[in-house]
């Protein structure tokens, strides 16, 4: 079984800063759009992770990744957001460092948030995480891009090369959230990882006046006087005054 939901490829997407890219800030039906790139070494399960998030299914047979862009809708704090998830080809590491194509760099620049995936069965993919995080932040100078680190294949303990605690420590050092998942066995942690990113991006996208509005909305406003209530109180006061005069 194969899932191919190719919306467009990285190369076809509008360049950041262009008018076309600005038009893509809103998804279908005018919903706010959250763009997420999933990156990591080859064979760590990036495509399987994306498909799990999209369909809650594990599909073990995939065509070679051509940079597919997937979409779905997610409820975040009562608001329906349009989510675009960009799957990417595996990153290679050479003696001089990361080997990132311009297409991949463009994908990272395009994204509002990034999921960095490594496999607990591949120590080199774990070592790549720190370099990849640094590369992501360099492509977003002046702003700290939300990033989640995901350790995949948690079910393959018999061949693990990376203790999950190392992933947690690394993510903490990088200032990222961390999730250990088994894409083949569970979809809850996968969904939570994406949900955290969507929530963080959603908060960053709020207009400057919105946070204040949200804070003040938590404080009960004094109710405006109700005219019917005022009339009722006035009649009660008047009746009491009349009774007092009559008794005298």
From Swiss-Prot:
GO terms for molecular function: G protein activity; GTP binding; transforming growth factor beta receptor binding. GO terms for biological process: negative regulation of transforming growth factor beta receptor signaling pathway. It catalyses: GTP + H2O = GDP + phosphate + H(+). Residues 205-229 are annotated as: Disordered. Transmembrane segments: none annotated. GTP binds at residues 40-47, 87-91, 152-155. This is Ras-like protein family member 11B. It comes from Bos taurus.
């Amino acid at each position: 079984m194969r899932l191919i939901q190719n919306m467009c490829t990285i190369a076809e997407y509008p360049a950041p800063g262009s008018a076309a890219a600005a038009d893509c800030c809103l998804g279908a039906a005018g919903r706010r759009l959250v763009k997420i790139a999933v990156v990591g070494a080859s064979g760590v399960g990036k495509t399987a992770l994306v498909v799990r998030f999209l369909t809650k299914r594990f599909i073990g047979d995939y065509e070679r990744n051509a940079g597919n862009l997937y979409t779905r809708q997610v409820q975040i704090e009562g608001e329906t957001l349009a989510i675009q998830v960009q799957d990417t080809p595996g990153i290679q590491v050479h003696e001089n460092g990361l080997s990132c194509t311009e297409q991949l760099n463009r994908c990272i620049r395009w994204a509002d948030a990034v999921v960095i995936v490594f496999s607990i069965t591949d120590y080199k993919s774990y070592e790549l995480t720190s370099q990849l995080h640094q590369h992501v932040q360099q492509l977003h100078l002046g702003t700290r891009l939300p990033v989640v680190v995901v350790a995949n294949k948690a079910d393959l303990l018999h061949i693990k090369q990376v203790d999950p605690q190392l992933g947690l420590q690394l993510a903490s050092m990088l200032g990222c959230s961390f999730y250990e998942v088994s894409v083949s066995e569970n979809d809850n942690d996968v969904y939570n990882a994406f949900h955290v990113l969507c929530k963080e991006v959603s908060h960053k996208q709020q207009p400057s006046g919105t946070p204040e509005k949200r804070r003040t909305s938590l404080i009960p406003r004094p109710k405006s006087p109700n005219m019917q209530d005022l009339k009722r109180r006035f009649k009660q006061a008047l009746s009491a005054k009349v009774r007092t005069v009559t008794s005298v």
